[in-house]
A protein has these predicted regions:
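Cleavable N-terminal export/targeting peptides
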Residues: 1-32
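Outer-membrane beta-barrel proteins
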Residues: 28-219
């Protein structure tokens, strides 16, 4: 079983390396770091915190390739998150490989680094397609087989997203509508020379009959 898991990890790392090599070109590389402060962590129609969530990120981009870390931390007893991702754009198509990791689920000092990034069910592949004003997304977890399909568009200044999912996304595990989201963003002027990007989202999950109103600022 360990050999099988190691083989899976090697294949996943090989995919990341392939994306990196295919993106090597004479372009300006750029590092970036920042954070979003959200009133609540809501992802794909489900809430993952009961209160404010700090979501830092660190990334490196070169041309159409980007690799980075993204985290979510809430002081409310919920599970923290630290993800590794790599993405590459080819015209209207975007490819992303993400490893979702929840450090609180692991006992300190008992997990080797290679096992940390080989958590079962944590690797997800995503394909995005821009078709004019419509953005389509398909994502699947390689080990768990969970699927997520979404379509997004802009209605003036408001972004609309409709998502469907199966497995853990829905109460019965069958494919169903689990996300209807309306989002809006604006800059809040602090001084003449400084402003804070702010966003708000109204999210409804028809499957769970849950609604969220989320506000956030970006640093």
């Amino acid at each position: 079983m360990k050999n099988l898991n190691l083989s899976k990890l090697i294949l996943k790392i090989a995919l990341v390396v392939t994306i990196v090599l295919s993106s090597m070109q004479e372009v300006k590389a750029q590092f970036d770091v920042g954070a979003d402060i959200m009133s609540r962590y809501v992802w794909r129609g489900a809430g993952y915190s009961n209160g404010p969530s700090i979501q830092p990120y660190m990334s490196y981009a070169s041309g159409d390739f980007e690799i980075g870390f993204w985290g979510a931390y809430a002081n409310d007893g919920q599970v923290d998150e630290l993800d590794l991702y790599a993405s590459y754009g080819i015209g209207p198509v975007g490819l992303t490989l993400t490893n979702y990791v929840f450090p609180d689920n692991m006992t300190p000092g008992t997990v080797a680094p290679v096992e940390y990034w080989a958590s079962e069910g944590g690797w997800e592949g995503t394909i995005g397609l821009e078709l004019g004003p419509i953005a389509l997304t398909y994502a699947t977890f390689f080990d768990a087989g969970s699927n997520y399909i979404a379509a997004g568009t802009s209605l003036g200044d408001v972004d609309l997203t409709i998502g469907l999912g199966d497995d853990f996304y829905t109460t019965d595990g069958d494919m169903g509508l689990m996300e209807i989201s309306l989002g809006y963003g604006k800059d809040i002027m602090i001084t003449e020379d400084f402003s804070l990007p702010a966003s708000g989202s109204l999210i409804y999950n028809p499957d769970a009959d849950q609604m969220y109103l989320v506000f956030g600022i970006s640093l």
